[in-house]
């Protein structure tokens, strides 16, 4: 179990590792259901440069700040940047899931 936690921390620094651990249990505290649904309903597309900058700033906030501050940062993102962040988050969750040991 400790080894899995180390891998998760390496994948996601700071507070993000704790948020991903919650996500692996099905709880996604950064996003409301509508944002998650919108991200999966829209066609996948490359992230625009301005969205990448906004997502990068949001990720720094998520890694460093308490959850309420991180949620406010996510909520303040333009729609396309929020959509990109949700998709990135779920890609990180997929990666974290792959790193988990198999359970029988």
Where are these regions (language model features)?
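Short amphipathic alpha-helical interaction elements located at domain edges
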Residues: 1-104
């Amino acid at each position: 179990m400790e080894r899995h936690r180390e891998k998760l921390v390496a994948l996601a620094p700071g507070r993000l590792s704790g948020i991903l651990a919650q996500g692996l249990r099905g709880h996604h505290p950064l996003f409301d259901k509508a944002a998650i649904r919108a991200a999966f309903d829209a066609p996948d597309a490359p992230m625009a440069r301005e969205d990448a900058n906004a997502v990068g700033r949001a990720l720094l906030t998520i890694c460093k700040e308490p959850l309420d501050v991180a949620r406010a940062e996510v909520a303040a993102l333009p729609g396309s940047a929020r959509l990109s962040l949700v998709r990135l988050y779920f890609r990180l969750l997929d990666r974290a899931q792959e790193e988990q040991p198999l359970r029988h």
